[in-house]
């Protein structure tokens, strides 16, 4: 195992049926302390990669190695321990609506540690301070904006100081100020924790300002990888179409159909 990499995905293939694969022979490496993006069009398999890393789905072939251990071969106790090392930010925050901001962040600390209440209080306030929301600790999720809720979810994802952070579409539905704030926090928190960060996103401009490396996916395969500069210089038409938002290209604008004149009987 190369100790420079916290996480390695080797020859990973997965599908709910063999006739319709979602991931096809994926190979990815995630360097310790790096911020890495998984990018690509909707339905290309990005979120499924995160689910495979967390062992929520079991691949037909291949391995996911976390610190050299295949997460899909761990027993129940081992998998539980591995998941405690993963922080997850879900696409829409997934806050507990019946708990206030403070208790949302305290939840993983109460569930997974035996820390005294006074220490949990201090840790929660520190996490909230890191995302600028210490003053909102007693508010309910219904009382805060979408951008603030995303920051609360971000604080919860780092509650246990995990070495691996995974963010599923963290920029979705955010206004420009909130988007910039979340991007800044992702980069800074990754550096502060020396955590390996995986970022699933469609947002090219904001993402390329904060990531060290990126994979571009299409139809369950990696079609491009490299630093932001290397990817922007790619001559692969599929990569170029996605990164530049071109309406037509390898991904066609028109869904296959008979000629319009024939359809209209002209």
Q: Which role fits each region the language model picked out?
A:
Residues 159-163:
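A short, proline-enriched helix->beta-strand linker immediately N-terminal to the Walker B motif
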